[in-house]
Design a protein with these regions (language model features):
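Radical SAM enzyme [4Fe-4S]-AdoMet core and its adjacent flexible, acidic
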Residues: 2-6, 54, 126-281, 285-297
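Conserved alpha-helical substructure of the radical SAM core
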Residues: 2-131, 220-221
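Residues immediately within or flanking Cys/His clusters that coordinate Zn2+
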Residues: 31, 35, 39, 262, ...
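Structural motif corresponding to alpha-helix initiation and N-cap regions
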Residues: 59, 90, 117-118, 183-186, ...
Length: 358
């Protein structure tokens, strides 16, 4: 384990930094939810995407928003993070993102990879995409069943290979959602990925949000979590580019061991999202309730909403719950991630205190 004293000092500094962000938030990651349509039907999808009605803004509306962001905020220091659904299902995708590129925005995307032919990969590079994360959730049979998409694994993997072949991107990442079912396939999937020149493998656990609430049997057990974090730590010790995602406070044992820095939920602090219909919120994984919608870009400037609202996201959740208030880790955890907080009962749905540490 890394030096515990140094870890604690760094976590204390991060807590001070978080307090500063609450007072003076700085937008770094702005998500564009271009569509809720998707050609896959993932059992864990936080947004319940698929063959669903998608009240999408038009090409002109998205381009107008990009113009407004350029005028109000500039392009330095922020990243447009494009997501869905599957963003590439929009026939105007390259028109919208080409416009963002022309104005000087840095942008990246999450995708299932199934639509990324070599030609599409070239177009993504040519219109300025910097980073991309492709989902591969286990080996072929498991992935296709989990995403309810026959052939999805093969097409997604080929999408990764096409991106690597074309090249010219800052980062090509594969993301794997780990479940009780596919955790046994991590080694096999690693063997597949190590022969492809990707930049990183991001491994995250399935959270009880969206459709995942209907499949509790897929959530990781206490033993699964320990297996997962030991697996990631050992890979990182061996110099492999594997990391755990940003969600959840992991305690002294695993913080900074399984990812590049310490836990900080940035929702509303330096992360915000523009939803498919123009609504403004913090993180797209947060439950879609009226009180979390801070405004709409069709009738308000994003900058005004960001600077004058978002108070619901700029507080310490650990103060809302007795268990958290009495926890010695609260000063670093702050109630954990907003997207797994139970706002009806004022308690975290995911807490690793009883799983990883006392």
């Amino acid at each position: 384990m890394l030096n515990p004293k140094l870890k604690e000092q760094n976590m204390q500094r991060l807590a001070v930094y978080r307090e500063g962000l609450k007072a003076m938030p700085q937008i770094h990651n702005l998500f564009f939810e271009l569509t809720l349509r998707c050609n896959e039907r993932c059992l864990h999808c936080g947004s319940s995407c698929g063959d669903v009605p998608s009240d999408e803004m038009t090409t002109e509306q998205w381009c107008g928003i990009i113009d407004q962001l350029k005028e109000d905020l500039g392009t330095e220091g922020s990243m447009l993070c494009i997501t869905g659904g599957e963003p590439l299902l929009r026939t105007d995708f390259f028109e919208i993102m080409g416009h963002a590129n022309e104005l000087g925005f840095n942008w990246g995307m999450t995708s299932n990879g199934t639509l990324i032919t070599e030609e599409v990969a070239q177009k993504l590079r040519d219109c300025g995409m910097k980073t991309i994360s492709i989902s591969l959730d286990g080996m072929q049979e498991t992935h296709d069943a989990f995403r309810r998409t026959p052939g999805g694994w093969e097409r997604g993997l080929q999408g990764v290979k096409n991106l690597v072949k074309v090249g010219g991107f800052q980062s090509i990442q594969v993301t794997t959602v780990v479940t009780h079912q596919n955790i046994v396939e991590l080694d096999a999937l690693f063997d597949v990925l190590k022969d492809i020149d990707i930049d990183s493998w991001r491994v995250i656990n399935m959270d009880p949000i969206g459709r995942a609430k209907e499949h509790p049997e897929l959530l990781l057990t206490k033993e699964d979590y320990k297996t997962l974090f030991e697996y990631i730590r050992n890979k990182r010790i061996a110099g492999e580019p594997v990391c755990y995602g940003c969600s959840h406070y992991l305690g002294m044992e695993y913080e900074r061991e399984v990812r590049d820095w310490y836990f900080l939920c940035t929702a509303g602090l330096y992360t915000a999202s523009i939803m498919v219909n123009g609504d403004i919120t913090a993180c797209l994984d947060i439950e879609r309730r009226p009180e979390f919608i801070q405004g709409n870009v069709l009738n308000e400037h994003f900058k005004d909403v960001w600077e004058n609202k978002f108070q619901i996201f700029r507080k310490d959740l650990s103060l809302e719950n007795e268990k958290c208030r009495n926890c010695k880790e609260a000063k670093y955890c702050h109630g954990d991630a907003y997207h797994t907080w139970d706002f009806d009962n004022n308690c975290p749905q995911v807490c690793f205190k009883d799983v990883l540490f006392d």
